[in-house]
């Protein structure tokens, strides 16, 4: 009869945290400058107009505006932020 307990699988029993990658702001959404648009590994989606790229390939808005996803050639995508229409921002004068 054994007098020691079995230790089991000591090399198992851990898991890494999820990286929470993906699109954070979708097409048609209004964003402010500095908002993160996409968290990604590598340039799966490329930066377009008014979009910056961080050192970890995160794409973020450089201006306030509306997010749009576009094609870049045949097999690539890009994300751009276009400014809001100037007429929508100005108050309407009462007569």
Swiss-Prot record:
GO cellular component, one term: cytosolic large ribosomal subunit
Record has Iron as a keyword: no
Region ranges (Disordered): 1-25
Organism: Gloeobacter violaceus (strain ATCC 29082 / PCC 7421)
PANTHER family: LARGE RIBOSOMAL SUBUNIT PROTEIN BL27M, RIBOSOMAL PROTEIN L27
Recorded superkingdom: Bacteria
GO molecular function: structural constituent of ribosome
Name under which the protein is recorded: Large ribosomal subunit protein bL27
Keyword annotations: Ribonucleoprotein, Ribosomal protein
InterPro entries according to UniProt: Ribosomal_bL27, Ribosomal_bL27_CS
Keyword Ribosomal protein: yes
GO biological process: translation
Pfam family, one: Ribosomal_L27
PROSITE patterns associated with the record: RIBOSOMAL_L27
Stretches with biased composition (Polar residues): 7-19
Family, per entry: Belongs to the bacterial ribosomal protein bL27 family.
